[in-house]
Amino acid sequence: MAVSKEDILETISNMTVLEIVDLISAMEEKFGVSAAAAVAAAPVAAAGGEAAAEVKDEFDVVMTSFGANKVGVIKVIRAITGLGLKEAKDMVEGAPSTVKEGANKDEAEKIKKELEEAGASVELK
């Protein structure tokens, strides 16, 4: 009779931390692997993700400050997002805040231009 993954996980969940450390050491010895090697590989994977992020199709429009024309910026936020007056006011006063997530480049540039014309400071991320 084979031992199922569920049985193994149940057994491990009932172990103490010291028992788990001993188990990991025994597995490293038995299979000739090192848990440290897997951890060291993780930053390499993250660095590869950053290279892929350079060619972006989607942008987040982030308002960093509303400038001197708070009322005008609130009006633009309401028009862009469809939020109510209170929600738009809270978004503007809570700057920096994300106005739009996952916008394509043209849409993000348009939103940025509208907000900057109203007096806000905007970043595309």
UniProtKB/Swiss-Prot annotation:
Keywords: Ribonucleoprotein, Ribosomal protein. GO terms for cellular component: cytosolic large ribosomal subunit. Disulfide bonds: none annotated. The keyword Disulfide bond does not apply. One of its GO terms (molecular function) is mRNA binding. The keyword Lipid metabolism does not apply. Pfam families: Ribosomal_L12 (PF00542), Ribosomal_L12_N (PF16320). One of its GO terms (biological process) is translation. Forms part of the ribosomal stalk which helps the ribosome interact with GTP-bound translation factors. Is thus essential for accurate translation. Belongs to the bacterial ribosomal protein bL12 family. Homodimer. Part of the ribosomal stalk of the 50S ribosomal subunit. Forms a multimeric L10(L12)X complex, where L10 forms an elongated spine to which 2 to 4 L12 dimers bind in a sequential fashion. Binds GTP-bound translation factors. This is Large ribosomal subunit protein bL12. It comes from Thioalkalivibrio sulfidiphilus (strain HL-EbGR7).
